[in-house]
Amino acid sequence: MFTRDMTIASFDPDLWTAMQGETQRQEEHIELIASENYTSPRVMEAQGSALTNKYAEGYPNKRYYGGCEYVDVVEQLAIDRAKELFGADYANVQPHSGSQANAAVYMALCKPGDVILGMSLAHGGHLTHGASVSFSGRIYKAVQYGLNPETGEIDYEEVAKLARENKPKMIVAGFSAYSRVIDWERFRAIADEVGAYLFVDMAHIAGLVAAGVYPSPVQIADVTTTTTHKTLGGPRGGLILAKANEELEKKLNFAVFPESQGGPLMHVIAAKAVCFKEAMTDEFKQYQAQVVKNARVMADTFIQRGYDIVSGGTDDHLFLVDLIKKDITGKDADAALGRANITVNKNAVPNDPRSPFVTSGLRIGTPAITRRGMGEVEAKELTDWICDVLDDIENEETIQRVKQQVLELCKKFPVYKG
């Protein structure tokens, strides 16, 4: 029998200590990993609810288990809100992650061995866009496009050329490390020319799209997927969206359940519903606009301090710092900044001469610092501190000075007040 006063702290102190350590780390470190964000206590409340106890294979009003009358309401709320938020005609809120959402799209629309055309991981794409180590590059014949070496932007002429030569079943647009606005209509035209599906993975920019500060692909692509964390700031999970197409909707639903997943995570779906409602507020729209402003200030400050930024700037929430000319590895830069309580991630830059485990760049994003309430003043200040460390990554005195400055800034802008 359970009682409401049961706690992890009293039952499992080892686990509790690690959990509290992570909470403290989040409060005392500056988070600049582009794919990370802080979620609201409301989202966490939903994830810790009794909904975690309920099995609900199937879809609302079409379940394989009894007792689903309340989880049906929960899932339908999430579906309806996702459709309203993104202007979609169809939404599936069951994918456990962005990668699983992508896998379901491939299974719904492609057969093993079909050609897919996606952005190279080395140029800013995602593992699931055809990387050789991913299922997407093993089950399907993946052809990869990249960036124009002169501009650092997507080479649409190359995309069109590869599409004409390889006749892909599906063209994948989207990224995990790209700082410019993608021309969705250009991709649509290329896909139509060769008779391919257009699949957009907007996992990184979904919050920006929801707020109207980045163009929406939802009514342009055949299918769009996203995660519900990152810029959306919700729970860790996936989402599939599409414009009206009854045959396509049936294929997508089947690909999620029963083809690739069993029971949905109802507590996470409830948290997605909360997240979608939060994203409809004016406060959220203002937040997303500030995310972009902060990213631009940071990119501009790096350039002023003598650092190269891939494509020369940013139009979204992230950018890549190219450290090749500085003769610093991404791995060493990541480690030095970590000692100063600044969390970034090493990242390959286009045509990177170093291995993916070392790299020559850093990926930096602003969703988390903006969520804490930081604006352009703090963004510039932070960038100057980062550059101070990178200018001499062996200087522990500078690292410790910056760490103290970071701790003071974190106290001023707590993640969770009270």
UniProtKB/Swiss-Prot annotation:
GO process terms (BP): glycine biosynthetic process from serine; tetrahydrofolate interconversion
Xref: CDD domains: SHMT (cd00378)
UniProt key word Metal-binding: no
InterPro entries, sorted: PyrdxlP-dep_Trfase (IPR015424), PyrdxlP-dep_Trfase_major (IPR015421), PyrdxlP-dep_Trfase_small (IPR015422), Ser_HO-MeTrfase (IPR001085), Ser_HO-MeTrfase-like (IPR049943), Ser_HO-MeTrfase_PLP_BS (IPR019798), SHMT-like_dom (IPR039429)
Catalysis performed (reactions): (6R)-5,10-methylene-5,6,7,8-tetrahydrofolate + glycine + H2O = (6S)-5,6,7,8-tetrahydrofolate + L-serine
The protein's required cofactors: pyridoxal 5'-phosphate
Record site feature (Plays an important role in substrate specificity), residues: H229
Binding site for (6S)-5,6,7,8-tetrahydrofolate: L121, G125, H126, L127, S355, P356, F357
PROSITE patterns recorded: SHMT
Pathway(s) of this molecule: One-carbon metabolism; tetrahydrofolate interconversion; Amino-acid biosynthesis; glycine biosynthesis; glycine from L-serine: step 1/1
EC class of the enzyme, as a word: transferase
Family assignment from sequence similarity: Belongs to the SHMT family.
Protein task: Catalyzes the reversible interconversion of serine and glycine with tetrahydrofolate (THF) serving as the one-carbon carrier. This reaction serves as the major source of one-carbon groups required for the biosynthesis of purines, thymidylate, methionine, and other important biomolecules. Also exhibits THF-independent aldolase activity toward beta-hydroxyamino acids, producing glycine and aldehydes, via a retro-aldol mechanism.
Alphabetical list of PANTHER family matching this protein: SERINE HYDROXYMETHYLTRANSFERASE
Complexes and interactors: Homodimer.
Protein name in UniProt: Serine hydroxymethyltransferase 2
Organism: Hahella chejuensis (strain KCTC 2396)
